[in-house]
């Protein structure tokens, strides 16, 4: 029995050792694995799902590509004795993101992942690739391994939508940059055909991650292309991972495992664990020791005012006061004489086209997605590689000592928080490598109040602060009481000698003497010199002396003295005598020129559009696509905005109105229009248009047009209305028998045919029927475009608004002219090379306008005004295109048939030629007038020669008018042509006989032809 028990114990011991060794081997193998985290991002939007028939075929190819890729995810052995292991997951997206499967280890999760991919049902709506990439990044970071350089995204998409589409998650550039910032490599795989390489290049990490990867193809070599794409991507990942996993020196292959070793010694003490959860509140402690000496107390309150002090000593004399403030400025002077009126400026040129308008408002946000299901709890991660410690930062500069602050009040301790729940102890992982700095997060909510901290140690005393600024000067104290009389002082120093006293009065006479007169005594010795007398007081200033004679002039001083102070304004002088009358000014603008100026400067005189009722019929079928549907709505709003701003159309009750009908298959029409219960202005209508949802059904255009006629056009009362139909021109006429010409009887129609999401061209026959081009009356306009983005082109919008406002109401700028006498008017047209054929055609149109105006003017008799047209070029190159004629139809036809000579310029020969014509053809009693088209440049002709010829023309009774075009004008020759004088140019005469325009297009601009014809008729 004992032997049996010993044998059983030995078996148990060997079994435990064998199990322990297997566990150790498994741990060794797991530690040597080199994991790769791979996530598929699959596009199942409408641009992929509905591109080819049968619908969903490209999605099926994408699923097949993904499953074939998953089958290739097998372990790879590296020479550094490590194995490449795969973790794979997938999502698919359209305008929302659906997680197919989170990261799953291969090969154990291969079958489940493939089944999930095969079960995909495409969404078939908008394409939000930016949101899908960011969701894939999140799944890689949350569910992947701890390594940073082993994460890959496989983005399978066609690159749609087009540029300019507003993506809700920051845009494709932002998503691609975020992946690069986090070290995630992104492969972009195309869904062909019609993919957008530009967008795919943005998605890829660099060109090596894009190349020519494709997941679908309509070519016979599809399987080979897909297989090559999968193999190339896997080889790139394998090479990248081998470099990162085998960065150390390679070792030879490991041998078979040896026998178990002896039990090791007791291990070293482990690292301190993480701080545990906050424990329960402890028992109250014993009373603490006496605390340290308290801080200095707070500053006391201000004391009461002291008693009044005694009178102080008399203060010393104060310092001299500061300079006073400058005095107030003097009164404003009298107004000067009014200036003379300035000369009238010439009308300016037309301004350049303004910059494009501001970008429109962003569209409305889509509905918020539903809350996702909670994910499964992840397995604990493997122990990471310890990160290298960061470099020690450089010591900062010592800051300046702050001012000594006053001690604050001691705060009251906060309440103890409730005991927290004790959490389970997690495994302590080594610190990872420092990650890149993430984007700045939003401001978080304030955290709960922390526990009351213990009293810190007394800080070191601060450095002594700098002396404060001197305080303000104190107020003068009150006078103290009178003091007691002081003791008698010591005698003072002797004072200064006083002034001499007054002369005393004469004394009384003494008694008479009784002695004899003695002899004169000898002269005494001269006495000593007396002390100097005291200086007398200063005398008063004496009277001013007479003015002395002027001295000789001094030497010149080359240095100028300082400028004196500006003197005060002098008194107004007397009014001067009126000056002599000035010369006669040039004549003011006539009536036609005033109208021209008003038309250019006054916006109220511009042509106005409206009232006009506008009807939009919007195709919302499946073949349009969600993105194109959004663009079509933007187009409607932009047309309304342009009509409001550029054409000043007022969309309000009683004025212009707008309505929009969107449609798909039968009975799916939706109407929004001004006059609805919840739409009372144009802003509400535009918001209602933005809120229209894509129907994505069939296409019954005829039924929609009939619905618009019965439900919308009956609301419109204006005779001026336009319908704009936006469709791909592919109506299902088998199911919809309603004719496409339903609107032809009631309104002009513009049919806009745009290629669908499959790039199929619109049906031109249906578009022509919608636009009523086969009808005898009310024919509209049919326009075709390749894609919907062209609808938002500036020039295209301009063409649409111009058609809507083709019947503008313009002010009447008629400027009637009257001939008081018969007149024979000749138009002498320059046909030389310097004019150019295009400008010559412009001149012909201008000549026809002049001829029509001359012949339709008020005149004494029907045949009293005749017009002739002659063109000229070089010498002996003159041609009468129209002899004197009063029939405008004949003149217009002849002018249209005029051929450009394209030769030299000789205006002298032309003037001599027309003198002969007038002598042969002019009537007696009729005024002779000629309008010469010339810039004054004539080959080989001097101003003196022109002067002689013009004087001969004037002597023949012919009045000359000149029309100069352009800026390269020979001014002296032009003045001679007008006046016949090379000197003493008469400005007033020139104003009536000389016309100038900056270029040939200005001939047909405004009412210039009326100005020219009026001046010729009046003179």
Curated annotation (Swiss-Prot):
From the record, which residues define motif Cell attachment site? 476-478, 529-531
Q: Where is the composition biased (Basic and acidic residues)?
A: 299-332, 370-380
Q: Which UniProt keywords apply?
A: Cell adhesion, Collagen, Extracellular matrix, Glycoprotein, Hydroxylation, Repeat, Secreted, Signal
Q: Where in the cell is it found?
A: Secreted, Extracellular space, Extracellular matrix
**Molecular function via GO:** extracellular matrix structural constituent conferring tensile strength
Q: Where is the composition biased (Pro residues)?
A: 253-262, 577-588
Signal peptide residues are 1-19
Coiled-coil residue windows: none
Query: Which residues does the annotated region (Disordered) include?
Result: 248-588
Query: Which InterPro entries does the entry mention?
Result: Collagen, ECM_Assembly_Org, VWF_A, vWFA_dom_sf
The entry's cellular-component GO terms read: basement membrane; collagen trimer; extracellular space
Compositional bias, Low complexity, is annotated for: 427-436
Mod. after translation = Prolines at the third position of the tripeptide repeating unit (G-X-Y) are hydroxylated in some or all of the chains.
- UniProt record, GO biological process: cell adhesion
Q: Subunit arrangement? A: Trimers composed of three different chains: alpha 1(VI), alpha 2(VI), and alpha 3(VI).
Concerning its family, UniProt says:
Belongs to the type VI collagen family.
Q: Can you say what this protein is called?
A: Collagen alpha-1(VI) chain
Provide the species name. Gallus gallus (Chicken)
Gene expressing this chain: COL6A1
